[in-house]
Curated annotation (Swiss-Prot):
Alphabetical keyword list: Mitochondrion, Ribonucleoprotein, Ribosomal protein, Transit peptide
Protein's UniProt name: Large ribosomal subunit protein mL43
Gene: Mrpl43
Recorded GO CC terms: mitochondrial inner membrane; mitochondrial large ribosomal subunit; mitochondrion
Cellular localization per UniProt: Mitochondrion
Compositional bias ranges of the Polar residues kind: 122-139
Family: Belongs to the mitochondrion-specific ribosomal protein mL43 family.
Residue segments, region Disordered: 120-144, 162-183
Biased composition (Basic and acidic residues): 162-172
Lineage: Eukaryota, Metazoa, Chordata, Craniata, Vertebrata
Main localization, broad class: mitochondrion
Lineage top rank: taxon: Eukaryota
Amino acid sequence: MTGRGTSSRFLTSVLHNGLGRYVQQLQRLSLSLSRDAPSSRGAREFVEREVTDFARRNPGVVVYVNPRPCAMPRIVAEYLNGAVREENVNSKSVEEIKSLVQKLADQSGLDVIRIRKPFHTDNPSIQGQWTPSPTNGLPSTGCGPENSGILLQLRCKHSKEPGALDRERDRIGSSFGFQAQAE
């Protein structure tokens, strides 16, 4: 499939999440299951063993358990952005349901789609994206201090021991990638 055929978007933060405090996007979790259907056995065991632990770990999520006669057990997840995800848990084990519920709690409610770029801004800079490299990966132009003959003068005012100037000159010169010259 080509890149133009799949939906995509720029990477954005959901509801500015992370500016201030973290807001979990899962708002409500509803478990519908039958009390006596054999396909609901894993869902019943999940409610008996794991649902209280999940509620303690996620205090911002409201958990509803609806025991009613139904053909297939299901989990309905409602998110803050209005998205609703419905998952069938027919004949699944407790561990599978536990991992599914945790996955629903960790998601944002948005569809999983291709991300165009790992960075995006609404106010782009005319200078381009910032990079810590001064040459931006380009070869050296020969205009740096190692090629222009600039004399590096260092003075160690705080140290009176012999050789301090030479050690400081060597330390600074090697960190900038050129050899310091003596005075």
